[in-house]
């Protein structure tokens, strides 16, 4: 079976891994980094992903960041006259990670395990799966991030029985899960979270503070300047990271704006205590889901054996202190919070291929599932934190006499009223025979698969007529749309490859022109006039070709110049070798001169020696 790669598709950064032997290995990207920024940029028809996209975000308005926050919604990104869904943008990141894995493994990769926040709903999970498909990946499993982290942490501890709390605060989402580990079984007891809370929000409180300080001092509102905002975002992210290691940091942004008297500069000294004050409400927001997860699992603090911190934002000292205070236990810092989730995904890939044995993963559904019933109430069929895969059926009936059809309104959430929960989908069961209200028996069945994706069936037990749907939210893509996007991704990948090759060719040709000019200058009178003229002509021909758009012409002119310069170099070396031989011959002639000079010797007698 071919390799299954593990991917942590993060809000801020993403990571790709593979199982080597029985150990998960993080694959470095071409820049040598173990994580890749989840940033996509569009420039002159070319798509850029990762560090190169992030670097030019300040000057390029066509840069997309934190797209994960929009997964499962009908949000669109309009770039250069074209609309992109979150699935398409995410697919570009996944395709980049796929290419990184293929370069490392030296073989085609088409299968992956992708992680999602435990609190992702059905629409968000389906969107992630669609993104994988667009990127040319068969998503073998969608796995919850805290579960993946526990898998990586507990793989070598299968002989121990432990209850583990995983506190996962990433770039854009927050989850807390409680798992029981023992005898190779990883069972999720409960999960809770907030999909709109993460490192981006910690950056934002710093940005808001800097904007307020600058406005107070200079009377200029930087929040209205897109370029200034991007510089502030980069500075805020850096300051946040710095304050995890030092007690204060200097934020310096020269020429951030301009006033009546000339350029304005931002200089702010941010202390850790001030940052903790600014972010206090965010940290407190993480505590309620933590308490909820503990309550749902039926555990007290003394029952928890280990606390694992996941996600880059858990490096913030105030976050670590809050977790320690809440659970009463020092968090385990033996795992890399940026990589552990992806490593767990690779292990799950190994479980699927059979390379990892004696490991069973029992995950849960994060939110309750049900349907709307009379009075606009939600009737729950599957409670949150139910182990998946699972199936549950319930009998319903009609609300009025001779009702010909029933409308099944599928919901996800914890509120008692249907309107307050998320609609996953609607469908109708029709052609119900005329009967008094309450007489027909309609069996509604919910199935949740191993990826947490929902299928719903409604069946009239009187006629055995059945209607079945896989939940498609308003943001989900049809098979036709996915197929079109897959083709677009393939075409764009080929176009991007051609553009890269063209850029490389132009750079090489430009470099060759420079080298030839330098070589001709250095050689001066050491080359013949005819050779020099030929090299000059070929060089000028290549320079002219570089001004045009004919790639084949550039390629052929480059090859012609390379040939001339090689011949020229060979002649120069030949001349140098001949000159060296002549010089050596002259030296040898001097050493073999036939003139013999007489020398005088004094005889030393033995007595003189004594």
Curated annotation (Swiss-Prot):
Cited NCBIfam families: PRK00290.1, prok_dnaK
Lineage summary: Bacteria, Bacillati, Bacillota, Bacilli, Bacillales
Family of this protein: Belongs to the heat shock protein 70 family.
Annotated CDD domains: ASKHA_NBD_HSP70_DnaK-like
Source species: Staphylococcus aureus
GO molecular function, a single term: ATP-dependent protein folding chaperone
InterPro entries in the record: ATPase_NBD (IPR043129), Chaperone_DnaK (IPR012725), Heat_shock_70_CS (IPR018181), HSP70_C_sf (IPR029048), HSP70_peptide-bd_sf (IPR029047), Hsp_70_fam (IPR013126)
Protein name, as recorded: Chaperone protein DnaK
Gene name per UniProt: dnaK
Keyword Membrane part of the UniProt annotation: no
Induction: By stress conditions e.g. heat shock.
Low complexity: bias regions: 578-592
Function: Acts as a chaperone.
